[in-house]
Amino acid sequence: NKIRINWNLQCEIDQKKDDCRREAPHCHITRNGVRVAQVWLNPVIIESGHSLDRNEIDLVIKTVSENRFELEEQYEYNKEYGADY
């Protein structure tokens, strides 16, 4: 389950159970398939050390905030029923 942010950015949730169990709910922002940032879901905060510009940060925070409940649901589902690989 991926959420398109703009033409080259999207938001995705870890698919593996172990990854979801290891950390608090978060999503990864990818640019053309490469992870460039991590965003915590509650509260919505972008992790330092990312490679996004100010406009992208604003757009990411807005998009994640608007989809936070759906992302948290998917994270919790994957925590229980995600892949074992």
Identify what each model region corresponds to.
Residues 1-12:
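Negatively charged, low-complexity tracts enriched in Asp/Glu with abundant Ser/Thr
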Residues 2, 15, 19-20, 43, ...:
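Short linear motifs in intrinsically disordered/low-complexity regions
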Residues 9, 31, 37-40, 60-63, ...:
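Generic detector of bulky aromatic hydrophobic side chains
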Residues 11, 45-48, 67:
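Generic preference for hydrophobic/aromatic residues in regular secondary structure cores
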Residues 16-55:
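A short, structured beta-strand/loop element
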Residues 51-85:
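Well-ordered alpha/beta subsegment
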